[in-house]
From Swiss-Prot:
Name the UniProt record assigns to this protein: Thiamine-phosphate synthase
Cofactor requirement: Mg(2+)
Region described as Unknown: 1-128
Organism: Prochlorococcus marinus (strain MIT 9313)
GO biological process terms on file: thiamine biosynthetic process; thiamine diphosphate biosynthetic process
Pfam families in UniProt: ThiD2, TMP-TENI
Length: 353
């Protein structure tokens, strides 16, 4: 690694300080880089972080390293109780982003006169890291959503007839969430936009409280407005590439399919999950011809993406679906019209396990 032109600093204390903060910044960048590499599989972030490390390395002159005095450094071995609270990978990443930003700021201040090239590089990297940290946070959220999606078994889709004013919608969904459903898809074709927004906000809050995914049907604007985990689209809705551009790469994108070619197209276009159905006749879409179990069997062999069988599913016909290869189901009436939505949800979940 070729060093930048440099005249040694006369003040030993400043040289030691710069050496320590170069070490701190480079080490912290490596921690973030490795998470982007192994945890997020984001090559473009890895390359950016690697470039920043190497740029700092070119400023890490021998005279700084020779000023190092580990034996007399009063900060050696010091720790903070907060370090024991980093239970998730993102906690480690966030702590190291902050560590790097602080180290770079110190370098800017103390290297401005004796090593202006280092100060300029530190400033540029610090501002770049502010933006990259947000990108990593979003990527981490997307990774978590997709992992959670893999573990989903039962998705509740709401009905347009539910009335928020009587608390039926919230009460029913909350009961199902308490029972352990993994995912809620908000669907309301009849309400005004203002009522949809109010309902979606309430449901999104409920889902966050219970650790469940919250998806909005059709309406990307509504999904973004309430910070939903994703959006579900039908065959006549926006093309996948347009939808992805609007919602970003870190939110989930689902697509309804009625036959194998649609499934293959949705998978090739980058959808995160699929709806397979309607398996049976439904009151929600009475005009839609049911596909029966044949397509369910095809889907079970055709894709590794998570997919949900949908359409007139209840406890009485669930076993036949399981035998056909369905591991996940989406239901509407079975729970929304139940006198005991919690008990029905538990019954369906137990049958899926």
């Amino acid at each position: 690694m070729k060093s930048m032109p440099f005249a040694p600093i006369a003040d030993l204390r400043v040289a030691q300080l710069i050496d320590a903060n170069l070490d701190r910044a480079r080490e912290g960048l490596r921690v973030v880089e490795d998470w982007c590499r192994f945890g997020l599989d984001r090559e473009e972030l890895v390359m950016t972080l690697k470039d920043w490390r190497q740029r700092l390395g070119r400023h890490h002159h021998d005279s700084y390293k020779q000023a190092r005095s580990t034996a007399t450094d009063q900060g050696i071995g010091l720790s903070h109780p907060a370090q024991q609270e980093r239970h998730e990978p993102w906690h480690v990443v966030a702590a190291n982003c902050a560590r790097v930003q602080e180290a770079l700021r110190v370098l800017e201040e103390f290297a401005r006169q004796p090593d202006p090239q280092l100060a300029a590089s530190a400033a540029a990297i610090r501002y770049g890291l502010y933006d990259l940290e947000v990108t990593v946070l979003q990527a981490n959220a997307g990774k978590k959503r997709r992992q959670q999606l893999q573990d989903c078994h039962l998705c509740l889709i709401t009905t347009s007839q539910s009335d928020l004013n009587s608390n039926d919608l919230l009460r029913t969904v909350n009961a199902a969430l308490v029972a352990g459903i993994d995912m809620v898809q908000y669907r309301n074709k009849e309400a005004s936009d203002l009522q949809r927004l109010t309902q979606a906000k309430e449901l999104a809050s409920l889902c966050r409280k219970h650790g469940a995914l919250f998806i909005v049907n059709d309406r990307i604007d509504l999904a973004l407005a309430v910070d939903a985990d994703g959006v579900h689209l039908g065959q006549d809705d926006l093309p996948t590439d347009v939808a992805r551009r609007l919602i970003g790469s870190e939110r989930l994108l689902g697509r309804s399919t009625q036959f194998l070619a649609q499934l293959q197209k949705a998978e090739a276009e980058g959808c995160d999950y699929l709806g397979v159905g309607p398996v049976n006749s439904t009151a929600t879409k009475p005009e839609r011809q049911p596909i029966g179990l044949a397509y369910v069997k095809e889907a079970s062999k055709a894709t590794q993406l998570p997919w949900f069988a949908i359409g007139g599913i209840n406890i009485s016909n669930l076993e036949a679906l399981r035998q056909a290869g369905a591991k996940r189901i989406a239901v509407i009436g079975a729970i929304m019209n139940s006198k005991d939505p919690a008990a029905t949800s538990l019954q369906l979940l137990e049958a899926l396990r």
